[in-house]
UniProtKB/Swiss-Prot annotation:
Active site per UniProt: S49, H90, D115
Gene name in the database record: sec11
Cytoplasmic side: 1-14
Entry's EC annotation: 3.4.21.89
Protein name: Signal peptidase complex catalytic subunit sec11
PROSITE patterns according to UniProt: SPASE_I_1
Species name: Sclerotinia sclerotiorum (strain ATCC 18683 / 1980 / Ss-1) (White mold)
Amino acid sequence: MLSFLQNPRQAAAQVLNFALILSTAFMMWKGLSVASDSPSPIVVVLSGSMEPAFQRGDLLFLWNRNLLEETKVGEIVVYNVKGKDIPIVHRLVRKFGAGPKAKLLTKGDNNVADDTELYARGQDYIEREDIIGSVVGYIPFVGYVTILLSEHPWLKTVMLGMMGLVVVLQRE
């Protein structure tokens, strides 16, 4: 069962394989960030505020390279609110002015009111600099795993334990 302890070369190879997988995932994430010009090129929909367009758990792909083009009313954007860590996925419903200093108002498709209550205190609108990216594609329900892991922390422990067990018991 613990035969990997008897063969340090095999144990080192398994550790290096695991490190290779982690570094590859990190490089892919950073590559997507640079290509899309977005700090978070992939986000998960955390609430039902954008139904029926997007369901809770949908994985969204963002693009932020259209800096020369104006953000258009009707676009679905992901933006950060000053002082809050969770990005919000909502539709741009009104625009005041033009250019990088235009004032933007957003609203969830499934919400009755606009997002002024979600913005930071004293902030009535968001600006282009608050936008992380525009949604260019999605995969339904794939992000639900991250929601489950954040809502049920014990699942992280179970999952990490199972992954560790697989690494320990794996034979080459």
